[in-house]
Amino acid sequence: MDASQAHDECERVLETIGEAIVADRRFFEDILVGVVGRGHVLLEDVPGTGKTLTARNVARALGLSFSRVQFTPDLLPSDVTGTHIYNENDATFEFTEGPIFANIVLADEINRAPPKTQAALLEAMEEGQVTVAGETRELPKPFFVIATQNPVEQEGTFPLPEAQVDRFLVKTSMGYPDEAGEIELLERRASRDAQSPTVERVFEESHVRDLRLAPETIDTDPDLLSYIAAIARQTRTDGRVAVGVSPRGTQRLFEASRAYATLQGREYVTPDDIKRVAQPVLAHRLVLTPDAAVNDVEKSHIVEGVLDSVPVPTIE
């Protein structure tokens, strides 16, 4: 699948999801960057903004299997990965798959889970497999996690470990709709019988696999590779940042830039592509100093400052 075909397919998905969910197009694009870029997406929003509905309809539009895991403080790793159950008829233990065995997994309120359970999800996200009772089992392909978390200021939530956060290609937020959007939401509800809207399937599973290979055909000028590296390195020199973007984060910025270029139907990356994805790809990877955290420094402002300070190469 070339970039032009990928663009047309992504537009169909964006239009289909937009028919069911009232949100900014950039939000949907961020999620598709995660899908096309072969990464995972972290959504941070207060309850009731439509995170679960979004994940479910993305899976439906892409023609993929979907499961939801509600993370709670007492959730065990086996509740996510599955467990062996004794079969009395055969006198053997049979493995019963957990909800992690789906193409798209919604990890709801991930920052309420104990570290041991988070570690099980971490292995699945990074390796595409889970280990149960010493036995490794492959997960379906494609495999994509959409995790949600409530803002850490809310009661009963805990910040995700740095290693966990770094595994997400993109972190984004729906936010509250504006007044016109909220009225549109009510008008849509008034025009249907079902409480929740649904979308039609746009893709087949094999189609999604082809789409995720499309960014590998996108060209990136050597000057832009230097630009990406310079952006990442600049985050490590800011006095408000204790831990800047890791080399893995640098690579993810490159991959997300190619994925966004694919969404735009271009066969090459531009500086604007890099700037467009820098916020959702980089901001959540920064660890602030204690002083910066106490003073409520916004990570997004740091990324904006980095983008303003790094010279943009001229690409012909």
Regions found by a protein language model. Name each.
Residues A3-H7, A20, T157, M174-V245, ...:
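Conserved C-terminal "switch" segment of AAA+ ATPases
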Residues A3-V41, V46:
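Pre-Walker A (pre-P-loop) alpha-helix and adjacent loop at the N terminus of AAA/AAA+ ATPase modules
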Residues I31-L32, Y86-L106, E135:
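Conserved alpha-helical scaffold flanking the Walker A/P-loop in AAA+ ATPase domains
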Residues V35-P73, P77, Y86:
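Walker A/P-loop
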Residues D45, D108-E109, A120:
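Walker B catalytic acidic pair
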Residues V46, V80, T148:
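P-loop (Walker A) phosphate-binding loop of NTP-binding proteins
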Residues R56, T237-E316:
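C-terminal engagement/docking regions of AAA+ P-loop ATPases
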Residues N87-D90, E127-V202, D210-E216, R258-L263:
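Canonical AAA+ ATPase core
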